[in-house]
Regions:
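Compositionally biased terminal segments of proteins
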Residues: 1-226
Length: 226
């Protein structure tokens, strides 16, 4: 185990797992939105999957104590019924959803993340192995979109790659996980994609990953998950 150097972050990914949504929750969440006085309130539907997925995005709160952006995803339509005063507009077609949240709409990723999480006081905290899978998939998705000419910040791609290495450095020889075929393929594709552009020794040192190389980390990742 390595004493990794803490890395500052400006956002936190929180996944709300609600299998049976109540009107009380919707009312409470709407109170949260009003107190934050969110300027941008959008809604969208993913028409490319069955059943169709619904998502909401709230951004730019007037109250700086509130999160800058909140996204809600539902794998069923019509579960989130906000009052008419909400004034929710369609998500602009040129805007995209956060990678990790969108990935969780996939059944295999959703179930694996829930199954591979710690539960403290009723809150699921994703384990190392599920975070590695999510970050690997996000890296692949963003890389593919950039290759198609879409506007994708290379810094986001690099961040996901480095996050995988930070996480994989915590795997031990005893770490063994059985992944669904979908996730196993994605992790394998990630490993193949980064072999020609492994993080250098400066990154390993600055991240506090100890006396180890990027190649050793990726080899352990393969042994643990493939």
């Amino acid at each position: 185990m390595y004493a990794q150097v803490p890395r500052a972050t400006k956002d936190i990914d929180i996944i709300l797992v609600v299998e049976a949504l109540s009107a009380e929750f919707v009312a409470k969440f709407w109170e949260f939105v009003k107190k934050g006085n969110y300027e941008q309130r959008n809604k969208g539907v993913n028409e490319n999957v069955e059943p169709k997925h619904e998502y909401f995005r709230f951004m730019k709160p007037a109250n700086s104590a509130f999160p800058y952006q909140v996204e809600l995803f539902s794998r069923s339509l019509g579960l989130m019924n906000f009052p008419e005063e909400a004034r929710i507009t369609p998500i602009p077609v040129d805007e995209d959803l956060s990678s990790l949240s969108a990935i969780l709409m996939d059944e295999d990723y959703y179930c694996f993340t829930i199954d591979h999480s710690l539960q403290e006081n009723g809150v699921h905290i994703a384990n190392i192995e599920s975070l590695i899978c999510l970050k690997s998939k996000a890296f692949l998705d963003l890389s593919q979109r950039k290759a198609k000419g879409e506007s994708v910040d290379s810094k986001h791609i690099a961040k996901h790659k480095k996050d995988v290495f930070r996480l994989a450095a915590m795997l031990t020889p005893a770490s063994r996980y059985e992944l669904p075929d979908t996730l196993k393929t994605d992790v394998s594709d990630f490993c193949d994609a980064i072999m020609q552009d492994l993080p250098n020794a400066d990154f390993i040192k600055s991240a506090g990953l100890g006396n180890v190389t990027s190649l050793q980390i990726i080899e352990q990742l393969k042994k643990s998950m493939l």
